């Protein structure tokens, strides 16, 4: 399958000095290239151009924020050479005062993240169900900004924490901004927004000690789980591979809430959205996620940056699930319950368009940290339902950003600005840049001809769906099926392969092993005995409590769409570590690297020292990194070439360490003819996923096929 927009041969290692040393060599470090790539010229990018400032370069002089040229930015003004600093040193005062105010409050949740710009292209018209302009004409392209994030940890936590991920998208449409706030799980942790603060308090670090960071491996989190059992489905997702994605480019995402589409005739259709990655859905192992968090806490950020700068643009298809108003009560789950998913086998996903991310931010603080997403930022044709979580989310996001960004003028910040004209009477507040020259700023008025005027719905004004609402004030749950906490978690378990089930048990064991309270551990085992008795019994044995007394709920259905075994597999953008020394077979290695390069595989050349390694035919290959600076867990596959180095014993030891860990993690390993000695001859035919080049004319194809498969679970 050809992934549209993928540009092969860009910064995949600069492998051969003689062939590739100058090929796109400077692109990764060239900041201006961020604005010159094909497809980057859209209305949002053009709008941002007027805010971009370059402060360095020939002829640029250092000034104050008032335009004063600075003669000395190194030493403060003192009374005598060894005297005290003088208060009249206004430059030092202003410099330090600004520094003292450079940080803004971090997000309570989703604090750690990163973002990119791109565009969404519609495949097919959705005119029959919605009047939203950007969903009308096939081929319509809409600029977007996407922010990926971790939920639990602080801004400085690790990317690979076992956690739910945020996937928030801002569409800059011709009718104003539309924000779609998605998560990497299809279900949420609470049924009602009232409980969200309690959930966050429980999973955050202990308020007395401020530990642990970015994890639910502590007593408070699991005490909450055991006593708020609506969270069971969410926890099953968290304990699965979905809680540790291989890459932001390889994870699905759902807004989890139920919305309405409204068409031009006023007809309402219930809708849920889903983003599906073109590269398939793939995960790290628990062991990998924990190790990577220590050796490269920026793993997902780095992966996003490298992919975009290489031209391997992340792509996702947008799908919708639609339910007619008259069918909302025909299912065994409530369509307004965010702890329940809509099974794809019951309510099919209709793919309607594709999003491509093709440009990184210019300034992390100005764009990624100041971006604001709000579920209540919608466009005509998209409306709310009585989803209890959505009702709370619809005001909470903007409220928290009023505090975090310190202004009511959030949409004046460039990344948040719509690409259409804005005219409103809410004009003042902190950091107001626009100079409004009107004397009238209220509605209705006669002095300004009652302008700016309202726009009727038939001409593009927003109007809420006229849903009939009646009943008494109550704090009851919306429906009886809200009380069914375990049927869908059981379906999720039934949908997993034996390997996925074992990984879920191991992840439970890892987290519950940190829980000190035996009572809490027992409560959790008893709770998840409702999901699967055998699973809970295996967990109980590991964490030292009794097995559950009750049997699991009698649900036999499954959903194949939930298993990652049924996802797409490609070699594209898989990352291969080439372990190499001097004296390698130049013809063989060049042939293999050329083929990997052609297939879009990312390559790192690893050896004892930086510089170059030389083959038996004189060919030189530039080394990207050294064994001391990298780790096997950072790669999807190994190509073991071997060779000669100055410190032969350490070189062989490093290779064996890489191979041992990659094999332990079920990863594919390609073995060059010069590296056969690293493997026991008697076991070569029994090493699943290990491909040998010796006497193998099909080595290239077999190795690339193994890279695409990614894991070999049948290893002994």
Residue ranges of model-derived segments:
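Active-site-adjacent core segments of small-molecule enzymes
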Residues: 2-583, 590, 597-598, 602, ...
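Catalytic nucleophile loop
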Residues: 517, 637-642, 655-681
């Amino acid at each position: 399958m050809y992934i549209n927009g993928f540009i092969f041969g860009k910064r995949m290692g600069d492998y051969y000095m003689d062939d590739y040393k100058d090929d796109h060599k400077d692109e990764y470090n060239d900041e201006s290239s961020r604005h010159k790539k094909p497809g980057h010229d859209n209305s949002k990018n053009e709008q941002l151009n007027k805010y971009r400032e370059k402060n360095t370069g020939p002829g640029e002089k250092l000034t104050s924020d008032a335009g004063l040229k600075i003669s000395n930015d190194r030493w403060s003004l003192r009374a005598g050479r060894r005297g005290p600093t003088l208060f009249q040193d206004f430059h030092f005062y202003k410099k330090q005062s600004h520094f003292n105010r450079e940080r803004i409050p971090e997000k309570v949740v989703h604090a750690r993240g990163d973002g990119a710009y791109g565009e969404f292209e519609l495949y097919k018209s959705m005119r029959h169900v919605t009047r939203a302009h950007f969903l009308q004409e096939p081929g319509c392209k809409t600029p977007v900004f996407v922010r990926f994030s971790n939920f639990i940890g602080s801004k400085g936590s690790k990317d690979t924490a076992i956690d739910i991920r945020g996937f928030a998208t801002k569409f800059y449409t011709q009718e104003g901004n539309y924000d779609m706030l998605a998560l990497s799980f299809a279900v949420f942790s609470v049924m009602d927004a009232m409980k969200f603060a309690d959930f966050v308090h429980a999973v955050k670090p202990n308020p007395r000690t401020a530990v642990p960071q970015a994890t639910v491996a502590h007593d408070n989190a699991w005490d909450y789980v055991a006593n708020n059992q609506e969270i069971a489905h969410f926890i099953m997702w968290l304990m699965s591979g979905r809680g540790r994605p291989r890459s932001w480019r390889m994870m699905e995402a759902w807004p989890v809430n139920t919305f309405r589409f409204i068409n031009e005739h006023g007809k309402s259709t219930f809708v849920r959205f889903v983003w599906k990655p073109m590269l398939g859905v793939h995960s790290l192992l628990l062991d990998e996620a924990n190790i990577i968090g220590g050796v490269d806490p920026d793993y997902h950020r780095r992966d996003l940056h490298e992919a975009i700068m290489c031209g391997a643009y992340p792509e996702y298809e947008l799908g919708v699930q639609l339910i007619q108003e008259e069918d909302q009560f025909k299912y065994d789950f409530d369509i307004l319950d965010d702890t329940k998913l809509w099974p794809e086998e019951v309510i099919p996903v209709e793919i309607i368009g594709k999003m491509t991310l093709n440009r990184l931010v210019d300034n992390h603080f100005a764009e990624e940290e100041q971006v604001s997403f709000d579920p209540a930022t919608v466009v005509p044709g998209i409306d709310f339902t009585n989803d209890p979580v959505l009702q709370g989310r619809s005001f909470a996001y903007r409220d928290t950003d009023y505090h975090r960004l310190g202004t009511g003028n959030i949409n004046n910040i460039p990344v948040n600005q719509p690409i259409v004209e804005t005219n409103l009477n809410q004009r003042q507040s902190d950091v107001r840049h626009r100079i409004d020259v009107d004397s009238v700023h209220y509605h209705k008025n006669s002095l300004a001809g009652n302008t700016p005027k309202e726009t009727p719905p038939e001409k593009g004004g927003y109007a809420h769906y006229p849903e009939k609402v009646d009943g008494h004030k109550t704090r009851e749950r919306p429906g009886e099926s809200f009380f069914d906490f375990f049927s869908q978690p059981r379906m999720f378990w039934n949908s997993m392969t034996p390997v996925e089930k074992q990984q879920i048990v191991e992840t439970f064991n890892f987290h519950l092993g940190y829980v000190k309270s035996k009572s809490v551990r027992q409560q959790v085992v008893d709770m998840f005995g409702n999901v699967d008795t055998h699973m809970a019994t295996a967990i109980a044995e590991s964490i030292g409590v009794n097995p559950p007394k009750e049997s699991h709920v009698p649900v036999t259905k499954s959903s194949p769409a939930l298993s990652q075994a049924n996802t797409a597999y490609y070699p594209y953008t898989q990352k291969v570590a080439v372990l190499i020394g001097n004296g390698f077979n130049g013809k063989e290695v060049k042939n293999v690297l050329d083929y990997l390069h052609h297939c879009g595989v990312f390559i790192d050349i690893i050896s004892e020292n930086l510089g170059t390694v030389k083959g038996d035919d004189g060919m030189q290959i530039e080394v990207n990194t050294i064994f001391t600076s990298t780790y096997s867990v950072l790669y999807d596959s190994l190509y073991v070439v071997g060779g000669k180095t100055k410190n032969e014993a350490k070189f062989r030891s490093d290779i064996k360490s890489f191979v041992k860990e990659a094999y332990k993690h079920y990863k594919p390993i390609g073995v060059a003819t010069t590296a056969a000695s690293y493997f026991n001859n008697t076991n070569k035919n029994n090493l699943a996923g290990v491909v040998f080049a010796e006497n193998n004319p099909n080595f290239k194809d077999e190795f690339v096929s193994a890279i695409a498969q990614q894991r070999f679970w049948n290893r002994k």
